[in-house]
């Protein structure tokens, strides 16, 4: 038996020579574990009697989620693939879970050089697992929210010639202006800036975790319908993420707490930049809900919905 190249089938193209997205934890946004067992007559059967059969050289594609990543922001969907680049067919089940919810559970027979590819269209934490009666073991791969960037990213769980499994993450490496992923330690504050200094404005959106638990959040800033900033923050207790705006114009900030799906939106106008120390403060409470308030030190008003 021999292995055939598969990564080109993922359509990721050549790796760009530019720097990657601004991220302080890229290496931790993907991980993989494996466990090997011998095959035999006592192998567990697939959980479903409907088995997808993918012909040699073909790819079966699935879409998982509501498509929210295509609706706005600077991040794009990521893919998880179960691939068989060997010359022999293999049976396996690809299971993908979003937090505690199973979102895909598909038994499949992959002929030689065949694959099953799932596109994840909602930003969240995912775990993928492959196992099967013709495979020597199982493989698990995880994708954290920060693994969704402006790049084309794919995690492939691949059958080897000896029927074991391996996991590889492949991504283009284009620069991603405005895309930030950060873990903020307890009591700390991290600050990012949108626009150039001296551009005539200074306004801040402040997102604070006022609880004793850690929360993962997404903070987007748009001008009109154009995305300008897309941050994913894991906020430890009593930590804050700040986005400072330097361009004097209208902005909309959209915030979401992953896990509770709580959302909030705040808007500012060019006139709001006249306020001294102008800021909109957003707080996460113990239930994972969001509250929006104008900085009490400023006299202007900010609309929120």
Enumerate the predicted regions with their spans.
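Terminal disorder- and signal-encoded targeting elements
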Residues: 1-305
